[in-house]
Amino acid sequence: MKSKISLVFKKCNEVEKRPALLTYTVAGDSSKKKSLEIINSISDHADIIELGFPHNTPIADGGQIQVSSHRALQNGITLPSIFEIIKSFKKKNKSKPLILMGYFNIIFQYGEINFLKNCKKVGVDGLIVVDLPWPENKKFAKNCKKYFIDFIQLLSPTTPIKRMKKIIKDSHDMVYYISMLSTTGGKLKVSPKKILKNYNIIKKINPLKKVVIGFGITTKTISSLRKADGLVVGSQLCKEITRSITKRQNSVTNLNKMVYKLKNKII
């Protein structure tokens, strides 16, 4: 049986001839209730929802996501409360894929198998573990499969071809390509042409594997990368939550409008 993630790519890439739009927000920002309202709202336009679990030392996250994480942690967000957010979201959006993204030490402290059991129970479709690279992640990725969860491998511009081939061979339904050597939310320092050139190299290794591009993608840059299988926007959304809070505006409405704009740029 095909996963929800692969079905979304089939619909977006093959039927609608466009990339899938993946949105990233931090679970619990700016509160548990608001976080759920945001993902419920943006799922009107996003094809796949990415939800990050906040961490006090997020090595790959840029300033905007760190601010979001800090707000969520200040509001007392925990892994069990993140599972509650996902459970509530899935009741309303059963067919919408949700990818949980975070750091391995939180999973390790919670207990790997216990974590995966809870992910399956609430309806998590995929996992990205930033600080668990290949081949160290092989055992964990295998366990994910047992619980019908996609483990999403990461590739970067410095990944050698030989290593890339091995990672892609071991990957599940999709691969996440980090477009540039930076934390998330940095300005796009590499031209879209260069990013797509690297993307095409990855696609040639196995054209059947779906490749999404993340880091530095905004309303300004998204349309230039529409040849990709999928595009991830995160920092711009976290920045909008901060702006909405500062201006005392409705972050749910503002994010819905932003994701609608992003979607229209790739249709």
Predicted regions located by residue number:
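Histidine/lysine/aspartate-rich catalytic loop segments that bind and position anionic ligands
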Residues: 148-186
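Glycine-rich beta-to-alpha transition loops that act as phosphate-gripper elements at the mouths
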Residues: 26-31, 101-109, 133-134, 155-159, ...
